[in-house]
């Protein structure tokens, strides 16, 4: 039986891999081991997701603090050890965070095939760590697993073999559908004194300049039909 080693470490990517083990059990022709790199360790950024989704990491790394470069180095070393001991047929990574880059580099050094979901995206903003990660590990020699049909042509325009680009869908939506009933029954809106049609809060990534990001967020939200009455307030929109 084939084995996939799925590596995640941050809040957004926890949500994207919740169905992987269930799919493996249903198919019966491959197994999944889950690695939590510890990039996000706060209870509200990590533990709560594993508890609510019923996930149990098979490997949990403890990475020392330090500079971003030092942490990336520790991640690569720790993930190399896990890959050696697990001996998977392929390593699966998601997105463009440091855990993704570290796992990709470790897998490449060990000549283990890499499955990269949400790969091949670019936004041209080199002030973002995520964009630097995308550029650092260019995937020209491996398949790309895309989650957005409208952007599948971008890697080909940069020289990627079109036959290596595969649309696989958005695994975060798989999680949304699977937990839809629990979401509807949740009392969290009441706990936070919010209503489905009331104000919403958007938390942007801290990279880049706030002025540029605020313009982009405003343009994106205002372009939606449901946001025709969008108002911006400096009381609620501020850089952190």
Show the residue positions of the predicted features:
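Catalytic donor nucleotide-activated moiety binding site of glycosyltransferases and closely related
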Residues: 231-240
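Structural beta-sheet core signal
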Residues: 6, 34-36, 116, 167, ...
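Active-site and donor-binding regions of nucleotide-sugar-utilizing enzymes
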Residues: 5-8, 14-23, 49, 60-153, ...
């Amino acid at each position: 039986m084939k084995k996939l080693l799925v590596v995640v470490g941050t809040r957004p990517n926890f949500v994207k891999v919740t169905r992987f083990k269930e799919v493996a059990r249903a198919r019966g022709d491959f197994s999944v081991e889950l690695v939590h790199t510890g990039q996000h360790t706060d209870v509200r950024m990590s533990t709560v997701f594993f508890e609510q989704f019923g996930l149990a990491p098979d490997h949990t790394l403890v990475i020392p603090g330090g500079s971003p470069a030092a942490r990336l180095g520790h991640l690569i070393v720790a993930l190399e050890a896990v890959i050696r001991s697990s001996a998977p047929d392929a390593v699966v990574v998601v997105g463009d965070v440091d855990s993704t880059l570290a796992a990709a580099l470790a897998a490449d050094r060990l000549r283990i095939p890499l499955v990269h979901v949400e790969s091949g995206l670019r936004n041209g903003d080199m002030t973002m760590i995520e964009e630097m990660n995308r550029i650092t590990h260019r995937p020209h020699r491996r398949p790309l697993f895309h989650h957005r049909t409208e952007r599948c042509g971008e890697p080909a325009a940069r020289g990627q073999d079109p036959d290596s680009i595969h649309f696989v869908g958005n695994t975060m939506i798989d999680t949304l559908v699977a937990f839809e009933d629990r979401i509807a029954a949740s009392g969290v809106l009441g706990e936070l004194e919010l209503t489905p049609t009331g104000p919403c809060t958007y938390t942007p990534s801290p990279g880049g300049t706030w002025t540029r990001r605020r313009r982009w967020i405003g343009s994106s939200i205002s372009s939606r039909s449901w946001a025709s009455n969008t108002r911006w307030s400096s009381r609620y929109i501020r850089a952190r």
